[in-house]
Regions:
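Short, membrane-interfacial amphipathic segments enriched in basic
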Residues: 25-41, 374-387, 419-423, 506-507
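Transmembrane alpha-helical segments of polytopic membrane transport and secretion proteins
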Residues: 1-55, 106, 595-605
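Short, strongly hydrophobic transmembrane alpha-helices
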Residues: 52-73, 413, 581
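Conserved core positions of repeat-based scaffolds
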Residues: 114-117, 126, 156-159, 168, ...
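Alpha-helical transmembrane segments of integral membrane proteins
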Residues: 382-605
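Repeated scaffold domains used in trafficking and secretory/extracellular systems
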Residues: 147-149, 188-191, 228-236, 269-271, ...
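Short glycine/serine- and acidic-residue-enriched loop/turn motifs that recur at repeat junctions
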Residues: 95-97, 128-143, 167-185, 212-225, ...
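Periplasmic/extracellular loop-to-transmembrane helix junction in inner-membrane transport proteins
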Residues: 45-48, 76-107, 111, 142, ...
Length: 605
């Protein structure tokens, strides 16, 4: 019976011991104020009373969670580049038309990061983020009169008034302002199209005129096409015409996927649209045919729309179809929700698309837009979303810093523990070796090694190399700290008792000494984490760390070396700099708070 009672009491005793360590000794209600705190409770109490340290924890946890969790909801293609979205300022007003237009709209056209529209009175409106200030210089109403058509391009706008006179403003380089002589005095213009660095104008007679960057698109008219054109579409390097007899004619001599037109549709085409990847044609019966490159999903036509399409429009990588039941369907790339069409109850009279935006104009003149609304933190010089890169860069920077700290802490604990416990020649030898490692300058060493290896190693191998070098060269500091703590702890009575019981040296270090100095190690590792993050960022900043296209907070700051970036594109360096600064300061505040919390003297201050 006694043996059974002992077995029952043993787990109960262990549970009580654990409870007392965390919760403290239970005290009577009358003695609550004088209740004793366990060491763990004292550390937690001291830390929670340090408002700066608590604020540091909150800031770091928020940044950490954002960098770890948000990329799952905001994925990023690290190879994505789009010069049409380069250096876009922060904001979400790209698809918000002015109140004076919404409810009285006649036509809307989508540019790269801005839009232009006209109301039923012929007034011109602009909104969005403008690539250059010249776009805001709209010719006066007295000069233009009543405008009947508008078209937005990469960074310029075309307009034509009721007298057939053309107007252009925005970028005036590469001959964009040189309107052909035949059109300057006014003409019977059927369609205008502002494109990527060039402009097009189609007359009612079926003649097409082009001007602008002639090196980008070399237009060549097949026999019998000029003078017989009913509609024209264009992307960044090709112009395609729809003739009055229902034929699709690419205006080029070069053969490509765009020129592989299905023969069965020739002579029966009623409308066309073109993305940067493919061409879509709608026949007189409402059937849709698509051909071109296989990327971005533009060839995947929804089966349910066949036979019901009444109009087509196209953005940079998506198509939009208006159906006979007044609904809209979009397919293709949906990176910026440009394929998520809204439900519109009113009768839709026209649809328009361009780049990453789409609009539907209703019978009452209301404008419904969907697609790219803007960027929270703007874009960089290659059109990449700064916010998404900031999240991915934070994940990379924190990962490099954390693994480097784990490596340095592991080596430092082993070397410092053995050195402090053994003493004598072993201590002397290990500490001299630590001094040799400390004398190696990290940044010059990493730069030289990176220059020597160059492109011989992959980007993944380079990242691993940086983590290993950071960890291997930064352990001496924690090794000295562990050595000093072990030297003090090895003289304690519990260590002598463990030796007397025959506990092995490794067991004494691991089970008896290390638990007593673990708080010191945690504090030092926390401070080293911030240092490693700054070191990695410094290396990436000067081009010897993690390189493009992989983002880190360091290489995102590289552009700040340019005076134009500092002055005009502030968002490219302000947001990464603030995030890195807040993160490292927060970690240092946490480290200082932990150091003060484990210091018994902090209770007296």
């Amino acid at each position: 019976m006694k043996d059974n009672n002992k077995k029952r009491k043993k787990p109960l005793t262990m549970m009580l011991a654990t409870r007392r360590m965390v919760a403290g000794q239970p005290a009577p209600a009358s003695e609550e104020e004088e209740a004793m705190l366990t060491p763990f409770q004292m550390v937690v109490n001291n830390f929670l009373h340090d408002k700066v340290a608590v604020a540091g924890v909150i800031c770091f946890v928020l940044i950490f969670l954002c960098c770890i969790v948000l990329p799952f909801f905001l994925p990023m293609d690290k190879y994505f580049q789009d010069v049409t979205q380069a250096n876009v300022a922060p904001g979400f007003g790209m698809l918000t038309p002015p109140s004076g237009l919404n409810g009285n709209a006649q036509e809307v056209s989508v540019g790269s990061t801005f839009s232009v529209g006209i109301d039923r009175d012929g007034n011109v409106y602009e909104w969005g983020t403008f690539p250059n200030e010249k776009l805001k210089n709209i010719p006066s109403a007295s000069e233009m009169g009543k405008v009947t058509q508008v078209s937005a391009g990469l960074d310029h706008i075309l307009a034509v008034n009721e007298e057939g006179k053309l107007f252009t403003w925005g970028n005036d380089r590469m001959g964009l302002e040189a309107i052909p002589i035949e059109l300057r005095s006014g003409a019977d213009i059927k369609q205008i199209l502002a494109c990527y660095q060039f402009s097009l104008a189609l007359t009612e007679e079926g003649r097409l005129y082009n001007w602008g960057n002639s090196y980008l698109v070399n237009i060549s008219f097949p026999e019998g096409v000029q003078g017989n054109i009913d509609k024209v579409v264009a992307n960044t390097n090709l112009v395609v015409a729809l003739t009055k007899d229902g034929r699709v004619e690419p205006l080029t001599k070069k053969s490509s996927a765009f020129t592989q037109i299905p023969e069965e549709i020739q002579g029966h085409v009623a409308d066309i649209a073109m993305t940067d990847e493919s061409i879509a044609a709608m026949t007189e019966s409402g059937q849709v045919f698509v051909w071109g490159n296989t990327g971005k999903g533009t060839l995947d036509i929804p089966e349910e729309i066949q036979g019901h399409v009444t109009a087509l429009s196209a953005g940079r990588y998506n198509f939009v179809a208006l159906l006979d039941d007044n609904s809209m369907v979009s397919w293709g790339d949906n990176t910026f929700q440009q394929a998520d069409v809204p439900g519109v109850k009113e009768e839709i009279v026209s649809i328009s698309s361009g780049y990453y935006g789409n609009y539907a104009v209703t019978e009452s003149g209301k404008v419904h837009g969907w697609g790219l609304k803007g960027y929270l933190m703007g874009t960089d010089d290659l059109g990449r979303d700064v916010f998404r890169r900031l999240l991915q860069g934070g994940r990379m920077t924190m990962t490099v810093g954390a693994i480097a700290v784990i490596i340095s802490a592991t080596i430092g604990i082993l070397v410092g523990g053995v050195s402090g416990y053994k003493g004598g020649k072993v201590d002397n030898l290990l500490m001299r070796f630590a001094e040799i490692v400390s004398s190696i300058p990290f940044l010059p060493f990493a730069i030289i090694l990176s220059s020597i290896l160059g492109n011989r190693i992959s980007e993944t191998q380079r990242i691993i190399m940086i983590m290993i070098i950071l960890g291997v060269l930064s352990w001496p500091g924690i090794a000295r700290l562990v050595r000093g703590s072990v030297l003090a702890e090895r003289e304690q009575e519990f260590v002598t008792a463990a030796k007397a019981l025959g506990v092995k040296e490794f067991g004494i270090i691991l089970r008896h000494i290390m638990p007593n100095i673990i708080t010191v190690i945690i504090v030092n590792a926390t401070l080293d984490f911030a240092t490693c993050m700054l070191t990695e960022s410094s290396l990436s900043f000067i081009g010897f760390g993690v390189t493009e296209p992989n983002p880190t907070w360091g290489n995102m700051l590289t552009g700040s070396q340019n005076a134009k970036v500092i002055e005009d594109y502030w968002w490219r360096w302000v947001f990464p700099a603030i995030t890195l600064g807040i993160c490292t300061i927060s970690i240092n505040c946490v480290g200082d708070g932990l150091r003060d919390a484990v210091d018994p003297k902090s209770n007296e201050r």
